[in-house]
Every structure is written in C-alpha cells, then in structure tokens.
A protein has these predicted regions:
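Alpha/beta-hydrolase active-site loop
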Residues: 1-22
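Alpha/beta-hydrolase fold nucleophile elbow
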Residues: 22-33
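A conserved short beta-strand
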Residues: 45-58
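Conserved alpha/beta-hydrolase "acid-adjacent" motif
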Residues: 62, 83-89
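Short beta-strand/loop motif that positions the catalytic acidic residue
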Residues: 70-71, 76-78
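Acidic catalytic loop of the alpha/beta-hydrolase fold
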Residues: 80-85, 112-113
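Catalytic histidine neighborhood in serine/cysteine hydrolases
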Residues: 90-91, 95-114
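Catalytic active-site module of serine/aspartate enzymes centered on a nucleophile-bearing elbow/loop
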Residues: 108-109, 114-131
Length: 131
C-alpha cells in the first residue's frame, strides 16, 4: 500500500525533526484519521506510546492482518452511522488489535457528525498515557 507506507515514512521524518528539538521530550502519541496509517505506524514506530484512531476509513486486509501486532494503548472513535465506511469492518479491526488496553467510543451520527466532546475524551486519554 504505497500511500500508507509513504505516509508512515513522512510521520517518522516529522518525529525525527520534532524530537531533535531540545524543548520536545517525553512520550509521543499519535492521532489520525486514516486508520491504515495509524495502525501501521503503531506497529513499526516504537516512539509512539499511545494512539487515537478514527475508524472512519476503509480497512484494507493488510491492516486487519497486522492489527494483532498493535500493543500500545488505543482510543478508537467510531461514528455508528458513517455512510462511507463499513461498521462491521471497523468493529472487526478493533477486535483484532492486540492491545491490552483499548477503548471504543461509538457515537451516533455520520462521518461528519463527530460530537465535540470526542476531542476532550481523546485529550483525557493522552493525558493518562503520556503525562
């Protein structure tokens, strides 16, 4: 999956640049909307200690296959009536993640109906795992 792999390489380059700054230290989290990128990054990048993933994009078989290798804490957001994505595929991916700590936050509404409190819940997750 060339786009996913290039995105992961770009994220790793961004991490290299940010973590080289003297004012940046401590554990790193990831939050992103393309679940294939976030899953792959969680598998290959040991500097990522926790992730917030949006289950609102296509779930390729390769992503489902590598999900058991994701062992960091996860906070997964799912819009229950997302008109562009398969809910069952998102639930299967969540089930396949190998993380001992994973939470699924399902909200009513479509792809663009993410409630504002979802951001606060994601921030609280990062505070618990990165502070």
């Amino acid at each position: 999956m060339p786009l996913r792999d290039q995105s992961v390489t770009d994220w790793q380059s961004a991490l290299d640049a940010l973590l080289a700054l003297p004012e940046i230290d401590g554990p790193v989290g990831y939050s992103g909307g393309v679940i294939a990128v976030g899953t792959r990054l969680a598998v290959v990048e040991p500097r990522i200690r926790a992730a917030v993933l949006f289950a609102g994009s296509f779930v390729p078989r390769a992503t489902l296959g590598e999900a058991p290798r994701v062992t960091i804490p996860l906070h997964v957001l799912l819009q229950w009536d997302d008109e562009g994505n398969d809910r069952q595929a998102a639930l299967a991916l969540f089930d396949a993640f190998g993380s001992q700590e994973k939470t699924l936050h399902a909200n009513m509404g479509g792809h663009t109906g993410v409630p504002q409190f979802a951001g606060a819940a994601a921030n609280d997750f990062f505070i618990r795992h990165l502070a």
